[in-house]
UniProtKB/Swiss-Prot annotation:
Coiled coil (UniProt feature): none
Family that this chain belongs to: Belongs to the Wnt family.
Name of the featured protein: Protein Wnt-8b
Biological process annotations from GO: canonical Wnt signaling pathway; cell fate commitment; commissural neuron axon guidance; embryonic pattern specification; eye development; eye field cell fate commitment involved in camera-type eye formation; forebrain development; forebrain neuron differentiation
Organism, scientific name: Danio rerio
């Protein structure tokens, strides 16, 4: 329930900013007045939600796991930080809003928008022409920019950072578009192709931005800069020199190993980690080291018995009957090291040093 309220709060403040701070004119084809905002509000809310869900997926096994408070931290000016996690959150939120608006446009949810057929009939490359129904990312980009960027009314370095990362998110959607083609020719031959652009799965956008997160650029500017024309010029010059495909941040990240109630950080104590599994990636297999060991915590193995339906059979007519199977599941958690473990480790290190001397 909390998340839904936060998402609709996000959509509300986007619309409020649109009504109070920005002229609502997009290529002279949008309606004006409250009805115009309501048309897109559900898509904005859904897009913000998809951004949050993707953020939580991408950071599920990181020390920072995109907590529910991330949206609040992003939209409340008094609480916002300017680290690389904030950069990712702005980008994925912006991407989510643009992606959803674009998809809903193609689905026919808006009267003033449809397929992008502006290049249809033009030669795209060797043996293929533009055609079909391309997803209208241009529409999604323009509308999402009007909504999302309206949140940043300041002219300081942090506002510039957020606007930059919003743009990175929109570029990510455009950059991951996929070309789909259909063959034309006699008897199934492919003498020529008609091609169009489609949105990828949103997971592709998330994966793309997670890579950008790892390579985010730190900008050395004072957060309070922007009180004079000279400082605003310096900020603009700095950000204009950085590619709109690279995430930027102003601050180093806090220590996510430790609990910090002021920042709403729970720390990693009590977190579940992964050790074994056929389908685990290398990153996932290292979670116990990353979340526990590297944070000075021990790994505790816990076993629990679960009950689930199994051996299901269809019986005529028309029921499915299942057995209830019990299974022991092993899970791993980060816990504080006991004094005994600490003393044992200290003794081993001392013994090792003595052996080296001899």
């Amino acid at each position: 329930m909390f998340m839904h309220l936060e998402v609709y709060y996000y959509a509300f403040i986007l619309m409020a900013h649109m009504k109070t701070c920005c002229g609502w004119s997009v290529n002279n084809f949008l309606m004006t007045g409250p009805k115009a905002y309501l048309i897109y509000s559900s898509s904005v809310a859904a897009g913000a939600q998809s951004g949050i869900e993707e953020c939580k997926y991408q950071f599920a096994w990181d020390r920072w796991k995109c907590p529910e408070r991330a949206l609040q931290l992003s939209t409340h000016s008094g609480l916002r930080s300017a680290n690389r996690e904030t950069a990712f959150f702005h980008a994925i939120s912006s991407a989510g809003v643009m992606y959803t608006l674009t998809r809903n446009c193609s689905l026919g949810d808006f009267d003033n928008c449809g397929c992008d057929d502006t290049r249809n009939g033009q030669r795209g490359g060797q043996g293929w022409l533009w055609g079909g129904c391309s997803d209208n990312v241009g529409f999604g980009e323009v509308i999402s920019k009007q909504f999302v960027d309206a949140l940043e009314t300041g002219q300081d370095a942090r506002a510039a950072m957020n606007l930059h990362n919003n743009e990175v998110g929109r570029k990510a959607v455009k950059g991951t578009m996929q070309r789909t083609c259909k063959c034309h020719g006699v008897s199934g031959s492919c003498t020529t192709q008609t091609c169009w652009l489609q949105l990828p799965e949103f997971r592709e956008v998330g994966n793309y931005l997670k890579e950008k997160y790892h390579r985010a650029v730190k900008v050395d500017l004072l957060r309070g800069a922007g009180n004079s024309a000279a400082s605003r010029g310096a900020i603009a010059e700095t950000f204009n020199s950085i590619s709109r495909k690279e995430l930027v941040h102003l601050e180093d990240s806090p220590d996510y190993c430790l609990e910090n109630r002021t920042l709403g950080l729970p720390g990693t104590e009590g977190r579940e980690c992964l050790r074994k599994g056929k389908n685990l990636s290398k990153w996932e297999k290292r979670t116990c080291k990353r979340l526990c060991g590297d944070c000075g915590l021990a790994v505790e193995e816990r076993r629990a018995e679960t009950v689930s339906s199994c051996n299901c059979k269809f019986h005529w007519c028309c029921a499915v009957k299942c057995e209830q199977c019990r299974k022991t599941v092993t899970k791993y958690y980060c816990v504080k090291r006991s004094k005994r473990v600490k003393n044992d480790n200290a003794s081993r290190r001392k013994s090792y040093r003595l052996k080296k001397k001899h």
